[in-house]
Design a protein with these regions (language model features):
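Aromatic/acidic polysaccharide-binding cleft in carbohydrate-active enzymes
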Residues: 243, 496, 545-566, 581-621
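Aromatic-rich carbohydrate-binding modules that target alpha-glucans
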Residues: 26-75, 83-118, 155-191, 201-214
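Active-site-proximal helices and loops of the catalytic beta/alpha 8
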Residues: 353-368, 373-390, 438-441, 449-544, ...
Length: 714
């Protein structure tokens, strides 16, 4: 007997706890086994399943530490947080083996270390699971000015689904299909309001409905509660690390030394950590020093960005994302000294205003970096605490453990990842929130077009903070773009109440990169793409901040096997980068270029910080630059390439293919081959035009090695 499992009334509980899935969660136990002589006071579990938050583990009678949690099917990354510290590499413990022998593998954590990987298998259940939550964008949203409705079902059990309204019924298309589920989709002209329900048939022919009671319906109120930003959907974003981009005004270079953290960090001075090499100015092509990450200054500035705007315009760039430009004590700028002041090493407020004006003239938006979780040692409130202790009005702005203390000593106060130069702010304090929101308002009114937010998952009372920040931001500038630095797949941040997008490493780095590198085949990649696009609303993926590299990863060309800093790029790796970037430009959302990737810049496998080396403007791989220009041109000319709609088609061995755009004339088919040999591919029925060659094709075609072909349906 076929048994129907309908998750309708249970959705209330699912919504409350943020659990929206197709398969029942399974119990999984994580265990840490210390060495016999190891003194362990605390162990916690952090991973992609909890936004890298902290789940304390319990000490067991046998001396091990463990925790049992419920996780939905899929693969997850994680680390054990031992005695309040991150292990850099989960694959290597003191004796040479892994920290967690139960891990099924390891993956680059983006910071030069390795995360462990676990896999949760699907619990086999009888019947069909149906899920539709009208309050979640993954099931109902407005995308490309159409109402999108989706139903998630068990895999390989449903033959047909219809959407039923008072006006009639419409057949829904099977949009996504992966190991743990399927998604049926329908888009309609944006209605004033809509009562609707789902009716369908299993592969055995049994009818089902959702809601199960025919007298009940779901309801859409006709209001777009989470507007899509079209300028993002149709755009191309370029990330700039200002200190290493271009030196447009050498006169301000020396100012970097005067504001450096060196002047505030007593702990470093006491331990003589600056004895051999302190903060320094370097020529634009000087060798990388041991202080390259943070205190080797090359002179990049706002004037340099202004000077290169026409170059960026020529690449098809429509928005800039700038790493922190406010007063700070480092080259990277994530140790803010004054949120209301442009760093003197980059220029003045007048320089920033000129940059905004010149960018806007060219049709470019400018997104700034915001760091509300922690400050630098030179931040005025922290300096007041250093001097006055509990008598300081800013004592409760931080989490101070003892006083007096030496600035830079992480045992004296809470700091980001235990880094003493980054004391953690108490964003649960109303005064702190009011100050930070004042910063948000000021720079939006100054002309900024959005915020990328650093480590949002680490803030105290994060959800409260970002819900309020969103309200303030959208009130000041409704089309401002809000991006969260979340590395994993996590829809909870993009439900319309906090952010517009995550930094989508989960798409570009975890899925596309591994296909381009050849680490996963087309079938596995298609499965991962389905899981990704099923998790998010189409309005969200249309606003995706889609990147494959950044200031926090290795250089993408090096990671693809292109060689190390100073080498000539390996030609095969260049072709892999072209394949990877083409996929990035054809999927929903805005492709993001990290400065210099379009020029073929290499980094170092062994020295992580070299990926931030200054762009050498006299050298470039011209074929890559031409490639990126062509991709931007295609996105501007072919509407389907910037559509929010994706449908999977075929994936196996070295082949990956998917559709973009609504079904019918004008939709495009993207076909990629990550292998070393030419492969045969059967086009779907009809006439297809190659968007690069112009020829009209039918039937069997051949896709060369490491190539992507794009076809438009006629």
């Amino acid at each position: 007997m076929w048994k129907l499992v309908v998750l309708f009334w249970l959705l209330c509980l699912l919504i409350i706890f943020g659990i929206v899935g197709l398969a029942l969660a399974a119990e999984f136990t994580f265990t840490y086994v210390p060495f016999e002589d190891e003194q362990i006071t605390s162990v916690s579990l952090r991973g992609s399943f909890n936004s890298w938050g902290e789940w304390p583990m319990e000490k067991q009678p046998d001396g091990t530490w463990s925790i049992t949690v419920d996780l939905e099917p899929g693969e997850y990354q994680y680390k054990f947080f031992i005695n309040g510290k991150w292990p850099q590499d989960m694959s290597t413990a003191r004796a040479g083996g892994p920290i967690d022998p139960n891990a099924i593998g390891y993956i680059n954590d983006g910071f030069g270390g390795q995360n462990a990987i676990c896999r949760i298998k699907e619990e086999v259940t009888e019947g069909v699971v149906l899920v539709h939550n009208p309050d979640a964008p993954a099931y109902l949203c407005i995308a490309d000015e159409r109402l999108v409705l989706r139903l998630k079902t068990s895999p390989h059990k449903v033959a047909k689904v219809f959407l039923v309204t008072d006006e009639g019924r419409w057949s829904m298309e099977r949009q996504l299909q992966w190991e743990y589920g399927e998604v049926f989709r329908l888009s309609l002209k944006f209605p004033d309001s809509l009562k609707y329900r789902f009716v369908g048939y299993t592969i055995e022919g049994t009818e089902f409905s959702l809601p199960e009671d025919p007298s009940q319906s779901f309801f859409f109120d006709g209001i777009d509660h989470f507007p899509q930003l079209k300028w993002v959907s149709k755009g191309t974003i370029y990330q700039i690390f200002p200190e290493r981009f271009y030196n447009g005004n050498p006169k301000n270079d020396i100012l970097a030394i005067g504001s450096d953290e060196f002047h505030y960090n007593e702990q470093w001075a006491q331990n003589k950590l600056w004895a051999e090499e302190g903060p320094s100015l370097a020529n634009w092509n000087a060798p990388v020093s041991s202080q390259h990450c943070c205190h080797q200054y090359f002179g990049g500035d706002l004037a340099g960005i202004i000077e290169k705007l026409d170059y960026l315009k020529g690449l098809g760039v429509t928005a800039l994302y700038l790493n922190p430009i406010f007063d700070s004590g480092s080259a990277h700028g994530y140790d803010t000294h004054d949120y209301m002041k442009v760093s003197s090493k980059f220029g003045t407020e007048e320089d920033l205003q000129e940059l905004l004006n010149e960018a806007h003239k060219r049709g470019m938006r400018v997104i700034l970096d915001f760091v509300p979780n922690h400050t630098g040692l030179g931040f005025w409130a922290f300096q007041d605490v250093v001097k006055n202790g509990e008598d300081s009005p800013y004592w409760d702005w931080y989490f101070i453990h003892k006083w007096p203390f030496s600035p830079g000593d992480p045992s004296a106060y809470e700091a980001w990842w235990g880094v003493g130069s980054l004391p953690k702010l108490n964003t649960g304090n109303l005064e702190v929130r009011e100050y930070l929101f004042k910063v948000v308002r000021y720079w939006l009114n100054f002309g900024a077009d959005g915020w990328r937010v650093d480590v949002p998952n680490e803030l105290v009372e994060a959800q409260t903070f970002f819900r309020e920040m969103r309200q303030i931001t959208k009130m000041e500038k409704p089309d401002a773009y809000l991006i969260a630095e979340i590395w994993q797949l996590d829809p909870s941040w993009v439900q319309g109440d906090q952010f517009d997008s995550l930094m989508n490493y989960a798409l570009g780095r975890d899925i596309l990169f591994n296909f381009a590198k050849g680490s996963i085949d087309g079938e596995g990649t298609l499965d991962n793409l389905c899981r990704y696009f099923a998790a998010y609303g189409e309005n969200v993926t249309a606003m995706g901040f889609n990147l494959v590299s950044s200031h926090d990863t290795g250089r993408i060309l090096t990671d693809l096997g292109g060689g190390n800093f100073g080498d000539l790029p390996n030609p095969e790796a260049v072709e892999k980068l072209k394949l990877l970037s083409t996929l990035l430009y054809t999927l929903p959302g805005a492709p993001v270029i990290f400065q210099g990737d379009e020029r073929g810049i290499l980094g170092e496998k062994e020295f992580y910080d070299a990926h931030r080396y200054p762009i050498q403007w006299d050298t470039a791989d011209e074929s890559l630059i031409a490639h990126y220009k062509k991709l931007a041109q295609l996105r501007s000319e072919i509407p389907a390439l910037t559509s929010s709609v994706i449908r999977v088609y075929y994936g196996t061995d070295n082949l990956l293919s998917f559709f973009k755009g609504e079904q019918g004339n004008g939709e495009v088919l993207v076909v990629a081959n990550n292998g070393s040999e030419t492969v045969k591919f059967e086009l779907p029925f009809g006439n297809w035009r190659s968007v690069t060659e112009g020829e009209v094709l039918q039937g069997t075609i051949y896709i060369p090695s490491l190539q992507v072909r794009i076809f438009e349906r006629l």
